[in-house]
């Protein structure tokens, strides 16, 4: 019981800035895991990694590097938001971030991001991401969310 109080006290000493920065970097790492999954799936379907990464950019003349960097940037921003949400909301009613709960919260967040993309962001666009199967996008977002939940929990445990 003392260990839980100690971790909670350490967590309370962390600033919102700490949570934002840790969420940013965790989001970028989780974005790499998501891109790796989509890259492997598309390789098995005959598409090169360069073609896959170019899909992440919105213009027709996008380079794979630009697409990958844009994906990392968006993943980082979503991770930052997740880090802040966890700090401001979720940790108010969770005394200790158990691994299973962290993964579940991350997966729920990934699912929300997928719904946001499918309902708000992609319908009015000519994005090549719309050509990727919804099943694979779902799995990719769950991978992103699970990785984000694990990484954010790991970062919280190392705050001090």
Language-model segments: which ranges?
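Juxtamembrane/disordered regions of integral membrane proteins
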Residues: 2-160
């Amino acid at each position: 019981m003392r260990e839980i109080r100690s971790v909670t006290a350490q967590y309370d000493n962390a600033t919102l800035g700490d949570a934002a920065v840790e969420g940013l970097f965790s989001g970028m790492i989780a974005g790499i895991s998501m891109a790796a999954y989509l890259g492997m799936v598309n390789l098995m379907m005959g598409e090169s990694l360069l073609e896959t990464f170019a899909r992440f950019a919105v213009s027709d003349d996008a380079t794979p590097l630009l697409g990958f960097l844009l994906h990392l940037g968006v993943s980082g921003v979503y991770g930052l938001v997740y880090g802040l949400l966890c700090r401001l909301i979720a940790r108010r009613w969770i005394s200790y971030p158990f691994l299973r709960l962290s993964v579940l919260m991350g997966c729920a967040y990934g699912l929300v991001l997928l719904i946001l993309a499918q309902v708000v962001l992609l319908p009015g666009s000519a994005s090549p991401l719309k050509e990727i199967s919804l099943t694979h996008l779902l799995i990719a977002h769950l991978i992103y969310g699970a990785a984000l939940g694990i990484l954010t929990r790991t970062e919280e445990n190392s705050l001090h």
